[in-house]
């Protein structure tokens, strides 16, 4: 297992912690590939009946893609990058056992999308989450598709086109968060849900989850190719590179 992920067992539940707190648990190649491998292995382990995803530290579940890494990307990197990102989301979707996200902080971009691929989401009123890709010069393609499974079109358009994050309170009101609890109770609530769902028949659980995947699989497959086309055009325009450069410079100034 890579150093960017921690694993804990709680009876029949496995807790996966994204462990890059110094960069708000941003997704780089190592974290992504480790997560894909780990989820695939856990799906084959009959002793594991539920999975809880969370992040290290008290600031972020996952802030999205590691901007230091993708600042070096060009249009030629889009195919391989997005193919592997899609594989990460698929690894979450393809779990035949319950997958619950326990939000310990902000969830943005790819981190938000991981959460949307899970079965249940537990958060707290003050947290922030959303789809800020457009502020980084990137088209919101995968995120806007995943939100269609949770939101009406009007709110989806608003979040995708403004890039603004919403509070946990609002996310619960519009149906993104399944459970809203005080911050200190998020993990306990998530583990309780996982324990209860672990007691249900694993065959019925697998078949029910497979049915939900079948209902949404055509769109999930199509969105990868749509995202590749859109992000190649975005990168060819130079907008992502410029937006990311400005963000990284501003971040460096704040740290200096």
Segments (PLM) and residue ranges:
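Structural motif
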Residues: 13-17, 52-54, 74, 100-102, ...
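Helix-loop "lid/cap" segments that line or gate small-molecule binding pockets
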Residues: 159-160, 211-214, 230-235
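Crotonase-fold acyl-CoA enzyme core
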Residues: 91-203, 237, 242
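Conserved CoA-thioester-binding segment of acyl-CoA-metabolizing enzymes
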Residues: 1-54, 90
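Amphipathic alpha-helical segments at domain termini/boundaries
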Residues: 1-19, 164-198, 206-216, 242-256
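Glycine- (often His-adjacent) and acidic-residue-rich active-site loop
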Residues: 4, 55-91, 219
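Charged catalytic carboxylate motif
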Residues: 30-34, 84, 91, 189, ...
């Amino acid at each position: 297992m890579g150093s960017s992920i921690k694993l804990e067992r709680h009876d029949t539940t496995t807790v996966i912690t994204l462990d890059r707190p110094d960069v708000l648990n941003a997704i780089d190649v190592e974290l992504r590939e480790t997560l894909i491998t780990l989820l695939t292995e856990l799906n084959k382990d009959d002793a594991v009946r539920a999975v809880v995803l969370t992040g290290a530290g008290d600031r972020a579940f996952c802030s999205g893609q590691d901007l230091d890494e993708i600042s070096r990307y060009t249009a030629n990197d889009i195919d391989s990058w997005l193919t592997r990102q899609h594989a990460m989301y698929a690894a979450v979707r393809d779990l035949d056992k319950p997958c619950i996200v326990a939000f310990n902080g902000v969830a943005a971009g790819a981190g938000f999308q991981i959460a949307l691929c899970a079965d249940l989401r537990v958060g707290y009123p003050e947290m922030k989450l959303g789809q800020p890709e457009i502020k980084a010069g990137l088209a919101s393609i995968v995120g806007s598709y995943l939100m269609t499974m949770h939101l009406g079109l009007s709110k989806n358009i608003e979040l995708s086109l403004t890039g603004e994050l919403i509070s946990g309170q609002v996310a619960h009101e519009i149906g993104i968060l399944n459970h809203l609890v005080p911050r200190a109770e998020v993990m306990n609530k998530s583990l309780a849900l996982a324990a209860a769902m672990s007691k249900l028949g694993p065959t019925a659980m697998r078949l029910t989850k497979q049915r939900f995947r079948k209902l949404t699989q055509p769109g999930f497959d199509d969105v990868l190719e749509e995202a590749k086309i859109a992000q190649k055009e975005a990168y060819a325009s130079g907008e992502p590179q410029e937006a990311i450069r400005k963000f990284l410079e501003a971040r460096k100034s704040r740290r200096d």
